[in-house]
Amino acid sequence: MAKKNKKISLNTIAFNKKARHVYFIEQTLEAGLSLEGWEVKSLRDSKVQIKESYVILRSNEIFLYGAHISPLKSVSTHVNSDPIRTRKLLLNRLEINRIKEKINQKGATIVALKLYWIRGMVKLEIGLAKGKKSYDKRQDNKLRDWQRDKQRTLKQINYRL
């Protein structure tokens, strides 16, 4: 008897919308996070902000800086809860080597894109990115405005019919 394919639900905790506006995302990877217990509890309440976070490669390990996980009020007082501590990303050695090659290119960086639950574990989607120029951002805004206007007119035409 064949096994049924289980649906994997991606429960998103936090987005970094600004990253896709500021950077061209060339490739995305899924990385695990090394967290403490109080951080997991805070993530269950979505008390996290990855808007100003960034990823750095240091001594063949990858770390997440600047992610703010607010501690819950019910966290015990004997635990030192630092909301902006550095968190290690869990990746294979092969993936780290690929990232290292990409980062050595001029203008390349790693950006945290999305934080989500998968099978009870917290995962971070990171993107290998290059910065956009201001004219690229203007072009994206024009395209987005045009798409919005197109949808609006189609909706009006369909409403009249």
Curated annotation (Swiss-Prot):
Q: Which family does it belong to?
A: Belongs to the SmpB family.
User: Where, subcellularly, is it found?
Assistant: Cytoplasm
Q: Name one GO cellular component term.
A: cytosol
Q: Which UniProt keywords apply?
A: Cytoplasm, RNA-binding
Pfam families to which the protein is assigned, alphabetical: SmpB (PF01668)
Q: Does the keyword Cytoplasm apply?
A: yes
One Gene Ontology MF term: RNA binding
Which PROSITE patterns does the UniProt entry name for this protein?
Answer: SSRP (PS01317)
Gene Ontology biological process terms, A to Z = trans-translation
Q: What is this protein called?
A: SsrA-binding protein
Among CDD domains, the record links this protein to: SmpB
Query: HAMAP family from the xrefs?
Result: SmpB
Function (record text): Required for rescue of stalled ribosomes mediated by trans-translation. Binds to transfer-messenger RNA (tmRNA), required for stable association of tmRNA with ribosomes. tmRNA and SmpB together mimic tRNA shape, replacing the anticodon stem-loop with SmpB. tmRNA is encoded by the ssrA gene; the 2 termini fold to resemble tRNA(Ala) and it encodes a 'tag peptide', a short internal open reading frame. During trans-translation Ala-aminoacylated tmRNA acts like a tRNA, entering the A-site of stalled ribosomes, displacing the stalled mRNA.
Q: Does the keyword Lipid metabolism apply?
A: no
Q: Fetch the InterPro entries from UniProt.
A: SmpB, SsrA-bd_prot, SsrA-bd_prot_CS
